[in-house]
Structures are given as C-alpha cells and as structure tokens.
C-alpha cells in the first residue's frame, strides 16, 4: 500500500492527502534530581524525534514543567507574591491537568529518590477549610486538586507528586505509549567519606523521611514492573538517549507509518483541510442539543437536499457550451441560505455539528465546509475560493491538480478569473458548500475588504444543484448585502433559547464537582435574559480557574452584570493580567495600565498573537518574551506559562501544526480595541496610513516579530511571518531584500506546485514593493551578482546574463536552471520585457546542456523561453526553442512519458505551442497531429492536459474538415468543464465560435449562436480586465478583447446586413481600434487594416439599399462571395505582435472587395438616385472620400449642423460614442483625431500608414481562407507574408486630407 501511494503521488506529481494526525506530546515525569537528563533529552533527542514526526505530518513536543525554576525574588511586588503563592498551591492540580492533556503519551524517569510527601498526614474535611493560608503547602495542593476534579488524591495523601502523576497517567488509565526509564547506580562502589556522611545523616531528623522515601520509591518501581509497563534501565545519558529515540521512533512509526511530508512540497492546502477538521472536532465537544438546534438542523437539511441528487459521483447533465456560457438570468430557486444572528449566538458551533451530522448520514453527498475562524492566515477571499475549487476538483477528478507557478494557471491571481474557475468547479457535480463567518473575510492583492464582504463578486445565478450555506453576524455588511439578493433564503438564529438550554450550556463547561456546586446558580441565570451561548461558555470556563486566585462567587456576580460580550471580555482580560502577568518595570498593576495594554507579559503575548500573520508557537512566544527583556527574576517559566494556558485553553487554541490562534473573533476584537488601541482590524490595516500613538504600538509589535524572525532558520515559518511584518511596518528595503535574497529565491524556486497562498503572497509583496517605488528586478540582479562575486576568484569561465555575471558551474546546472525559470516567472508576471535579455544571455548555456538527468528541467526552460518569445512577438525565435524541446522529447517513448508526469506535461505544452507557431510543412513532416492523437490517450486521467490536447488536436485539424472540427469542439466542452474554465476555455470558446462560423458558410442557422458565444467571451474578458493589476495580464486581456471584438463585428457583418447589425459591428470595430492603438501603438499594421475596412463600410453604406446592393454585388455562386467581413471573424489579433498578419489579411480582403465593386458600375449610379439623409438612417462618411462623394454629402453636413448636440455613449476604456442618434459613425477622438493635422497630411496616413500586402488568391480562395482558420496562422512571424504587390489604395489626395480635417472640425463643433 505504501509503495502504491508513493507511485500514485509521483505519477500525478501531486501531494498525498494529509489526515488529522494527533501531535505526540508526552508528559515528562521525574523527581528534581533529573535535571541533567531533562536537559539532554530536550536539546539532543527531542529535536530528532520532532524532525521524524515532521515527515509524517505531525510534531513531537514534550511537556516539561520544571518547578525548580519557580522561585520568589525579594524585588517582587505584592501582586507577584500573591501570584507565586497561588501558583504553588495548584502545583499538583496543574501537573495532573497536563498529564490528562498529554494522554496517552507519558515518559517517566525514576532513580533512588521519591520526592516530597506528607509523612504524618492527618486527613481533613474539605468543607471545614475556611482559609487556604492555614494549611501547609502540601495540604494546599491536596485541597486545590481535590476541589478541581481530582478528589481521589485524598485517598492516598501520603504520595509524592511523582507518584500522583504516575497514578493518573498509568494506574488509573491504560495506554501502550508510556515508557519508564530507571536510572541504575552501583551502591557497592562507595568511598569511606560517603559512608561517614551516611552515618551522620542517620542522626539527623530528615533521615527517617528519606528512608521512607527510598522504601516508597522501591515499592513504586515494583508496582510499575508488576503491571507489565515497559521499563528500561540506563546508566548514562547516551544510553538513555538511545533508548528514548528508539522507543518513541517506534511509536511514531506505529501511529503514522506512511511518510506524508516530502521536501520541496507546499502542503498549505492539506493543512487547511486539517484546520477545518480540527475546528469541527472542537465544536463537537462543547455542543449542546436544544429545540432551537434541532429546528435549525431540519431547515438546513431540507434546504441542502432539495433539488439535489444525493449521488454526487454522477456528473451534471448538460455539460455543453451553453451550460458553460450561462446567462445571468433571474434565479428560479433560492440556492443560498444565510444563517445569521448576533455575535456569540452559537452559529459556528451549530453549523460545525450539522456538517458532521450531515456527512455521517449522507456520505455520498459532496460537501465542502470552510470555517473562516479556524485559521488566522487564510481568511482572504481568494484563498477561500481557491480552497473550494481544489476540493471540488479533487472530488471530481481524483488527485489534486497541480498549480504550477509558471503555467497558465497564474491567471487565477486575477480575482474575476478565479471566480470563473469557481463557477466551473461548482458545475461539475451536485455539491453543498458551507462558508462560516463571512463577516471575517478580508481582501488581498487588489481586492478590498469591503468587496470581499459584500459578495458583489458572487454571480447572481448559481447552478440549481449547488447549495451555498453561509453564516454571518446580523449587523455585518455581508448580511445586509446578501439579504438584498433574490436567491438568498435567510434564517435567523435565536441566541437566547429557553432556560433549560442555558443551564445545559453552562453545565457543559463545568467539571463534575462544579456542576453540583453551581447547581444553585440556576435561579441567578434565570434573572439574566441577555445571556447568549458565548457568555455562558465564557463565565463557566472562567469560574473553574479564577477560584484559585479570588472569590469565584464575586467573579460570577461581576460577569453576570455586564451587558455585552465585549464588556465581559474586558473583565476577563483584566483578570488574566492581574493573576498571571507582571510588567518589566517595577510597578503595581492598575486598571488604567490593563485597559491601555501598557504592562505585563500576558498583554504582550495577546498582542503578539493578534499581530502575527499565521499564529505563533509556544516556544516562539517564550523566546520572544525573553528577547523583549523578560529574563532573570522577570522570566516567564514553563510553570507560569502552563498556568496561563490552562486558563486560556478554550480561547487560545493550538492548530494541528502547533501554532496558537484566537478561537473566537470576539477575543481578537477585544485585544485589538483594548490592548492595541486600534479601530481597524490588524488584518485589514494599511501600512501607508498615517500612524497615531496607538498605531505606533501596533508597529512596535510588528517590529518585534520582524526582529525575531530575522534570526530564525526554518524557512516556512520565516516566509509566513517575516515579509508580512516588514510590509506592515513599512520597511520596504528589508522586504525587497528578503524576497530577492538568494536563499529565499532558491528555496521558493525549488517548491513543486506551490500553493495559491504561497504564490499569492509572494506576488502581493512584489506588487506592494512596485507601488512603493522599489526596483525588485534590480534587487534580483544584485542578489545574483553577489553569488557570482563569491565564486569569481575560483572560476574562469563566466556567462554574461542580462547585466549580471553568473557562473553556472558554481551554482550547478540544475540549480541555475531552477533559478532561471523562477526569475522568468517573476519577470513575466510583472510584465517586464527584460526577461528577453535574461534568456538571450542564458541561451548558449541551455544549448550546451547535454546531461540526461537534466532533461526535464531543460524542457521546462526551453518551453518557458519559447513562450516568452511568443508573447513578445518574436515567433521565429520562440519556434526555435519549441523545436529543440520537440527533438529532446523524441528521445523518450510513450511508455517513458506515461511513467513521468512532468515529461508528459512538457510534451503536452510543446505540442500545443508547435500547433500555434510551426509551419504546416513542419507539422506534416513530423506527424504532430498523429502524435497528438496518440498522446491524448495517455492523459485521460488529467483533465487539464486532456483539455489542452483536445484543443491542440482541434487546431491541427485541416480546414476542409469543417464538420469534424465542429464535432471535435463539441467533444472538448465536457473536458473544459472538468478542467478550469478560465483562460483556456475562453480560447476554446472563441475558437469554437470560429468553427460555428465555418459551418455558417453552409448553414446560417448557427450564426446567431456564434454571436451569442462571442458576446459572452467579451463579458468574461471585460470582467477580467476590470480587476487585473499586473500590466502584462491587463495588456494581454485587452489585446485578446480587441481580437474578439473584431471577430464579433465580422459575424454581424456576415449576416443580413441590417442597419442595426451594421451599427453594432462598426461600434465593435472602433472599440477594437482604440484598444489596439493603446496597447500595440498607433503605427501597428493591424490598425491600417481596420481603418480601411471602416472606410469601405462607410462608402457602401452611402448607398441606400444595402441588402439589395450586397446581393447584386455578390450574386449567389460568385467566386468573390467571401467578403472582407466574412473573413474577419477568422482572424486572431492576439498574436498580432507580429506586425504583418492583420494588415495582410485585411488588405487582401479589401482588394477583393474593390475588385468585386468595380464589376458593378451601374450599382453606384442606381444608388445615387436616392437622396441621402431621408428615409432610413445612413452612415455619414467622415473619413477619406473623393470630391464627388464630398459634393454629394454636403447637404448631410448642413442638416446635421442644425441638429441638437449629440449624446455621447459610454464605452469601455474611455472611448467616445461611435454612433450618434442619427446613425452617423465617428472615429474615436481619443485615438484617431488626437494629433494636429497642420501638416496637411491626415493622421491616418501619417501615423497608421503601413505597406499593404498582397490580396487573396483569386484562383484558390479556399487556400487563403484555410490559412486564416488554422491556429498556426495566428502566430506567424514578421517574416511570414505574401509576396508584396502594388498597393491597393493609393496615397490620399489633398482633397481627401482636407475633407478629413473638415470632418474633424465638425466633430469639435
């Protein structure tokens, strides 16, 4: 089984699914004379065991309460002496508490000593004890332990603390994970001086007690051996260490036999899954069943299973393109349920228990719960959505899909695209999503906290088979926004409940003795109608701890008097500080100090936890306190910490990875408000906002944590915390130095499939630095230069790389390539063109690499370089790298590819890139289509690769096989549905629409459907552009949008040529023109082609009977029937980085149009009989025109001047209206007429003029059309073009230029 799991993980290059692993926390029991053994184990053995546990998904941490370190100091304040006395009185009780918490793990060290005990003890009645001070320390410990859950200690009062611990751990309970280590000594080898000292001790008063102790320890050892407990005997520290390491390694192996954690794997998602499971388990322990809870359970279940097929293993019907391209219509059913109520009413506990109950009764239903309060670092909306996507895809597709930092999935960092992926994921199978605590959601990477909370990002129509259950505080923005939606059903949770329920909740959190003692509190609870479950839980848990330090009944009265949860927390925080804390300065703790949060280590701990990004471990907090100055007699010992944690265990809980966090948001709010003094949540605060005195305190704690983690060496902890605190402190130089440091860069670049959280925060820090004006790229280059400088004296051969000098031999080839790919991803994501220079210098090295062991890394590098050249328009160079990668891949058989998922992935990418860039001859000679068909059979279990291969096959299908192409596109849709539904599906939708257009050439019934598909693609791209923050992402989205606009215009112009369709098409062309001028430059060749097309449309619309004219112009069966706009939808301008393709195709079509028009001279004369401007609205030609056309249209301008001012429509990218209310079309002023025309030459000629290309072949028009349809044509290099012929359009005359200027002046009016 283990081998199968490892093989499966390697096959899919995915991480194993981590399960809830209970941490191994043995309690260390020994007498005071074992300090050397404890130190040796803590420093040498336990770290080894923790490393061993780390590979199994858990951790090892021994609990060692060393009371010897607890000493009173003469400089103590009165409050500290009180704390010291109270702490000693609960010595026994505290130890037994931790024995229980560590069960079933226990380590006992025994020697010749027994420990302190009461030799002549007289039993006393607990009820007769009036004053604890009247008892001895031993009696105080017995009294406190007996009153707090351990009454059995009074039955054997003459035992030592060590024996009490052994009784509780091993005699009263049974466990196979308990080990006893007996220290042996040779009593025969004694000197004469030792014998004389023993004779003197016999005469002392303590001799008899010591002798009794030796007898007792002997009996205790015999009892341990008699019970068959595992006992080991050791003579020295090394022997003890070997025994402990062997025994507890076997325990780890027995409990967690499979190695779950591997190096260079990001397990963030798996750990999040564990956090939610742990949260549910904690809520189950405190849940109280009531009438209200049963009623809510029934409502939740009715909502969840309504219209839901309980067999979630079946896919959703209707997985075609129409279901993918959903139109946001009004919902026919309510697919969202909102459970709301006041804070502390028990929403989270109720939902967690309902989720557990529902899963147990309906195991076949796909349910994904997410509790925002279960972890403090993953409360941003993008992490939440990504968690849902990963869980849904895992259930639908098997192993989790990899999320490569360098692949196309980087666009999930665009929030709107992530939502598209989410919508695709919930369409896979019937599912139930549960999101608890939505008012705590925060934004990140351009998403504001308000946007995250108001749920405006959630589409108005969810699939009927998806049920979304949310919970929120009634007064929150989330609740108010969701209540306004028509598809939301609201359920209000009554927080008060009946009296029996209140008392049950109160008793649930009390120990058995306390339940009897506080039974008399029932009448008091009845008098307080404002007690919600959170208040009752807080009061009950406090009463069990506060009685050691003060009168519990007085505390109860104070707690019951407060009106709100926040006021109750203020009282509890005040008690924690007074009873457990002390300040660094010698001054009494006052109420003012407590409220201001200015004193005490407890205050510092709470503030540090609140400020931390992902939580802090116990060891980290104690080390930070020591760094802050809590040393010597101010030192916070393990015993002090244990007492504090015992009181806060219900509210400061430990995650499965050992980090502490606030269990309830109300505690975090109280700490932020009363101790930090901030009004804005720490997680939503902006470091750039001006800081007042209270914010300075917050910044101080950020700086403390920053200083601490700068000294740490564990990468993941440093990465989680250090850059966060640098950002929040505004320390931009340090943040830039951190993310560009060689150590951090090297580690991150080696991570396989980094989680979204890891990538998101890295890119977020890059984005923050760019906004702050830092040059992150230069920092990267300087960092690499430092590496080179260290080895410059040893190496002679150097390779110059983009302004820096690197030594691949020093870095090792694999490490060099890894760093290169990481830096490429960084540059590409930031839209930096210097990536080109980077790879230009690296190319000689890449070519020289011949090691077979580096083939996978080399393939990845070659693919990355080729794609980079593809993006910047250097198609031929990109193709060169794709061909090299293809040659390297041919060394492997299909069987080899099947074994290695990484090789298969690179194979898929290479074929996809070749299909888009290689010539038809290369594809035929290398049988790429046949090879792609064969490879597709091996990727059936990976939806992403399967979708990519099907898309590649579709691109490679010859043009003549139109019906096969369309059928292939239909078969691709379900695969896309199973994949991501993001950028790849957008490409396929656009390509599929082109296939529908080809079918339109034979049947026009499909044209309307193609138009709708294009409009949906435009909406998707517009939404993506509205939230894109990366310049490269935004540029590509806008270029892609321009392509789709042109295609849609071509679809409209290929129809019935009605006035409305023509106006709409022209508006799309002008929008495309604006986008292309903005992102490709006004001199780009494609702009000239679009402008020529617009002029021809305007000239044609100058005639009165468009449909009739077009029918006459292109009679049925004519070889010229393929007009310029019929071919327009087949163009893809996304790759118009190459400056020839668009202009070539456009001008070829224009040439055909003019030739066809010249064959019908009588048509123009017929049209001249109709007076323009009357009857149907016409296009007013305002571009270049002849003198005759100018004269014919002079009356139009005269009539238009008399009309009222035209209203301007609103179009994306700040373009002016292209169609006025009379149907006149005007060029975009922003793009076309923005420059002066004083030179007499029109702007269109002076800026947009490019040489025109040859026309389509009149003999074989299908050959040219096939080139338009083929995807590879879309990525031609600048050298690919037809043989230039004489320009179709001569240079404009001065009359045309003046006419153009007149039109411009008229627009100004």
From Swiss-Prot:
It is found in: Cytoplasm. TPR repeats lie at residues 399-432, 651-684, 817-851, 859-892, 989-1024, 1042-1079. GO terms for cellular component: cytosol. InterPro entries: DCAF12, NACHT_NTPase, P-loop_NTPase, TPR-like_helical_dom_sf. Its main location: cytoplasm. Keywords: Cytoplasm, Repeat, TPR repeat. It comes from the Eukaryota. This is Tetratricopeptide repeat protein 41. The gene is Ttc41.
